[in-house]
Amino acid sequence: MLEDIKENKLKGENNMNVISLINAKGGVGKTTSAISIASLLSQKYKVLLIDLDQQGNATGNSGVDEDNLKFTSKDLFLDESLKMEEIIINTDKGYDLIGSNLEVADTSINLVSKLNREYILRKRLKNINYDYVIIDCSPAVDLLMYNALV
């Protein structure tokens, strides 16, 4: 499958490829797909998996205890003073992770009053060095999903 990935795809400002798994229905395989894609790509590329789902299944299935996270994807959006290196977790799965848990549930509500709220994730990812960023979204149409699309 790695051979099937074409190099002429759309790339971000820093040549990073972003793949967002989005579906407004739960239980359709977003998390399983996100983890599988991250695992496969990490065999050849530097990969970051971002868990935006408050259930934290991508986090837990990446071997990280979602109940004991120092920082979550909530901090990614709401605390821009934190360096990305502080939020990113190195996993033993071959890819890095920004984890999630129930604390992420109110993140979208807290973004409503922020300027350029749809571009926060794009801005935060701008200066990190990954070949691929895989984003596992929750089954909600909210500002986190919009950030994953932009």
Model-derived regions: residue spans:
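P-loop NTP-binding core
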Residues: M1-V150
